[in-house]
Amino acid sequence: MARAKSRVKTITQVKSEQPCSNKRQALSQLKRIKWNIDFRSENQHHFWKTIDTNDITFCAGPAGCGKTFLSVYYALQMLAQKKYESIILTKPLVEAGGEKLGFLPGDVEEKTAPFMMSFYYNMEQIIGKQRLGILKDTNTIQVIPLAFMRGITLSNKFVILDEAQNATTEQIKMFVTRIGEHSKYIITGDLDQSDIQKHKSGLNDAIKRFAGVHG
């Protein structure tokens, strides 16, 4: 898994010396983080370069290969550089064959929080819990369930779809057509951990369809 050089030490110093209480302070402190990545494999480096040069990137790989960490690290770095207005996090919330949030208590964010822990854990390691909380509270980092994307055009956003192996072909098609002006998409998943049949996986279908396509 990829790690930022001296990542824990750098974040601990920034976090302890400069507590923040608002979005402006949080974003200002992001600029002071040393954004250096130590790639652990050529595949990780290739993934990073692909994100850098394309508006939409698909990545399939096993758990622990660093795809989620690299995705959120890149997104947070771009946010620190003010390249995008905000970060959108999404997953297909598969439960017994479909997205069923209605029976869970709380609002949408509370319902989806257990599904988004992989995002939050990695982001906390990079920018600290306090800054993450402020950026979430101000919708600078926002969670939108994949099923709720229909009809939304996402402009000036950095969007990460994880666990995409559980999205159907129709959901992936709907998702990629939501991209607006000056936005970047990363779509990741593990085809060996799909909760739906592999031939129905939108990620599997998209990788086959878009193999060799750049842009």
Language-model-detected regions and their locations in the chain:
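Conserved helicase motor core of SF1/SF2 NTP-dependent helicases
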Residues: 2-13, 22-36, 42-161, 165-215
